[in-house]
Amino acid sequence: MSEVVYGGGDSLELDALAVYSHPDDAELTCAGTLLKLKSQGRLTGVVDVTRGEMGTRGTPEQRFEEAREAARLLRLDVRVNLDQPDGHVFVTDEARTALVRVIRTYRPKVILTAHWDDPHPDHAATARLAREAARLASMRRYDEAAGQGAAPVPALAHAAYSRLVAPSFIVDVSEFVEEKLRAILAHRSQFYDPSSKEPVTRISDEGFLKQLESRWRYAGSLIDVAAGEAYYVREALNVEDPVELLTRPMNIYS
């Protein structure tokens, strides 16, 4: 059953909603974008599809509190957990209905999510779940008994993490790197701790955050800034002012 982790409110309509599989996924992937949007006065939220209970480190209870603290640091307007089974995320009718209800409640203009070719099965399934729920939320007779009414179809932007995915756009997050790191490290059970007796995982390895920062720097270098977050949009982008778009800073060697 879905649970509000932080914030909320029935009349809240979001500009951007990040939909990711596990607590900490949104922080690792799009925290800079969420922070930038907040600095512009936008309303933002996160959906964690699972509680991360299959993770090697930390308990679901710890991860719940860490997600709440990270939401505070990101200044989110709402954070929701869909309570789907970790390691078993599939595009089921139950999962679609749960996410449709969140979309109809908060009516986001944009959904940020994983890419459907992500090597983690939960991440790939979450990308497909987000796409299907975004469309179904606009269908008046889908889950009609819940009494919510249809919502406009939000645009979807997928994280462009792999070298095989060419970004459609990159967000300059140079000003928000330190805040992003603080939000990531709010999930303290998951990352490097020299005193921890728990098994070492890829993300708890001492060098993981440096590797992550290298990715942000690389994405930033493609648009000639210090740090960036890259996204892929499957649909063609409708550009109102090509001069404004094409005269923004970019790296001609990218």
Task: Cite the ranges covered by each PLM segment.
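Active-site rim/loop-helix segments in enzyme catalytic domains that contact anionic ligands
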Residues: M1-Y106, E244-P249
